[in-house]
Swiss-Prot record:
Biological process, per Gene Ontology: response to nickel cation
Function: Transcriptional regulator.
Cofactor: Ni(2+)
Organism, scientific name: Methanococcus maripaludis (strain C5 / ATCC BAA-1333)
Family: Belongs to the transcriptional regulatory CopG/NikR family.
Molecular function terms from GO: DNA binding; DNA-binding transcription factor activity; nickel cation binding
List of residues binding Ni(2+): H80, H91, H93, C99
Name by which UniProt lists this protein: Putative nickel-responsive regulator
Cofactor remark from the record: Binds 1 nickel ion per subunit.
Keywords, in A-Z order: DNA-binding, Metal-binding, Nickel, Transcription, Transcription regulation
Statement: the UniProt record of this protein carries the keyword Metal-binding: yes
Alphabetical list of NCBIfam families matching this protein: PRK00630.1, PRK01002.1, PRK02967.1, PRK04460.1
Length: 141
């Protein structure tokens, strides 16, 4: 039998309600099982991102609440710290409260991961997705 630890978490009501809908839709026996699956997926994603090496090109997509204190300024300052990686950015207004930025990057994978981690950890950032590819000449044949 696997050792289990009991934990407690606080979630916004709407986030939990949406999660519960998915639990029911997918037929999970319990919230605990769904949370375990979600944590496993997160760990797999984390390991994949942190195993990347070499020269890469890709996008970092960021959704944030632009009303959150200084989030736009913090994101801009972080991007300026990594200007050698950033090829271009696209900014889009999603609704009255939220914006999306897509940052095109090219450079060393470890630096791209570092930039992604810094953007992800900012208060007001709701979601970050890193997509990377091997630049043209480096694609295995």
């Amino acid at each position: 039998m696997v050792d289990m630890d009991r934990i407690s978490i606080s979630l916004p009501t709407n986030l939990l309600a949406e999660f519960d809908e998915i639990i029911e839709e997918r037929g999970y026996a319990s919230r605990s099982e769904a949370i375990r699956d979600s944590i496993r997926d997160y760990l797999i994603k984390h390991k994949w991102i942190h195993s990347l090496e070499g020269d890469r090109a890709g996008t970092i997509s960021i959704i944030y609440d632009h009303h959150s204190t200084d989030v736009m300024e913090k994101l801009t300052n972080i991007q300026h710290d990594y200007e050698k990686l950033i090829v271009a950015t696209i900014h889009m207004h999603l609704d009255h409260d939220h914006c999306m930025e897509v940052v095109l990057v090219k450079g060393d994978a470890s630096e791209i991961k570092e930039l992604t981690d810094k953007l992800t950890s900012q208060k007001g950032v709701k979601q970050v997705k890193l997509t990377v590819m091997v630049p043209g000449g480096n694609i295995p044949q």
